[in-house]
Regions:
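Positively charged, polar, low-complexity stretches
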Residues: 1-96
């Protein structure tokens, strides 16, 4: 089983986040570090995966929007792969 917890405030760039996901979930070297590649790896995984997003702040609006896109990809992947679990810990403030 692969487990990965992602705290939104720890990432300043898309590249940092994608690299963290790649390493944390042991994705192959050919992982494209983009949303399409993320979806492909999540839906094709034969290993159980648990992903948890802790939305605890953002470096900037670009990262906030990207986290929303990653969350949508994960939600879509859950529908295709029963071995995938995805949860989000939302902040108390509005706007997510």
């Amino acid at each position: 089983m692969k487990e990965l917890s992602i705290a939104s405030s720890e990432f300043h760039t898309v590249e940092e986040l994608q690299e963290y996901i790649k390493i944390g979930l042991h994705f192959p070297d050919y992982y494209g570090e983009n949303l399409s590649a993320l979806y492909d790896c999540l839906t094709q995984s034969a290993d159980p995966i648990i992903l948890e997003f802790d939305v605890d702040g953002f470096f900037d609006d670009t990262m906030k929007q990207y986290f929303k896109k990653v969350g949508k990809v994960c939600e879509d992947a859950v529908e295709e792969n029963e071995l995938l679990e995805f949860s989000v810990i939302l902040p108390k403030e509005e706007g997510w």
